[in-house]
Amino acid sequence: MVARLLLARHGQTEWHAENRYAGSSDVALTEEGLRQADELAGFAAAAGPSAVFCSPQSRARRTAEPSAKALDLPLRVVDELREVHFGLMEGRTRAELAEADPDAVARFLADPVSGAFPGSEPPADAAARGAGALRGIAADVPGETVLVVAHNTLIRLTLCALLGIPLENYRTVFPRLDNAAVTEIEIDGTRTGLLRLNQPARTRYWVT
């Protein structure tokens, strides 16, 4: 039975506002990020998902909390939805790393999988855990619609894994996911369909 998953990236954080890679680091939402969380809650209230899941990281939890509250639902934390650990890149901008290690940046830009930043979680591992998490959620909620709040790179890698897209293409096929924007997928066993990508969480975009 098909489950519909509404995948939302967390709201803006202090580091993302500065184009810093946050990864596994815990970084607070900005005022704009808090506003985006409230906007997502407005979307959730209109969409009416039956459950709200999120990553254990504070930026995802803080983004998901207003939606869970608006729906009077418990927030269900899934550890496997945490963001990719970026190793040497954590807390840095790409320009800063380019000064310290230009070869590392060049390898990443050429192939973000084989050229992943030194010390980072292997992208294939992140994609596998993300896909496993979403398939597990879908299996638990057959026929239902749920909201899942997670992270930019984790969601993009997971989409590639679920849709059969080569992982090394995740940055070109899915160049970005905006803060608090929603991507809609359907999962039925091992089959996944992409319905909408990176849509702003304003209810007028979701009238069907």
Could you describe each region identified by the protein language model?
Residues 1-3, 84-96, 139, 144, ...:
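Acidic, low-complexity terminal tails and accessory targeting/binding regions
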Residues 5, 144-152:
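Generic beta-sheet signal
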Residues 5, 12-70, 116-131:
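Loop-to-helix element that buttresses phosphate recognition and phosphoryl-transfer chemistry
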Residues 13, 154-155:
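Short active-site segment of divalent metal-dependent hydrolases/proteases
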Residues 46-50, 139-147:
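Surface-exposed helix-capping loop/turn segments at secondary-structure junctions
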Residues 48-80, 106, 184-208:
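Conserved histidine-centered catalytic loops in small-molecule metabolism enzymes
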Residues 69-131, 196-198, 207-208:
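Phosphate-handling substructures
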